[in-house]
């Protein structure tokens, strides 16, 4: 079996897709729609204020993920460096653009800080759980994240393409390269380790969801300065 064939990443994908609603994805099995974030992105009514908070909180998580794999002495983290999916630098440029347009950039307000701290803890003691978050956070941005970017651009930004939705090279191949790397890292895992990784999926969705909800927050503050 080659790394391009079936691997553990396929199991991760199946578990994560089940946690979507049918409205969000064809494979979705989540039946209860608790709020707007559980609906198709095309039906969202985003706000600039909320979107800026989303970008700020997301950058904290990307900062943490990139720092962990860059600084760690553990050899398996080296496989996750320079994937081409890194977003921290691009988000920084986008936030600078918003600032140049007269928008106040909010400070971190909780979810991103909490998630980054949790990832730092996991990375030192629980590789299977960390890999779950690494996979879900990056892959979500290339799928639903791009739809969010398109919706926000069309409704709020006069169709401006932000840097965090641009990748160097063909995205399909970049994603396949990361799938191969994760399959390589997980190749020697026991079934118990794999199950532990999969069981972390729901928690990764909760952390991401806490950040995602900012996009739909009321436009009460943070307008042009």
What is each PLM-predicted segment?
Residues 1-225:
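Metal- and O2-centered redox machinery and metal/ROS homeostasis
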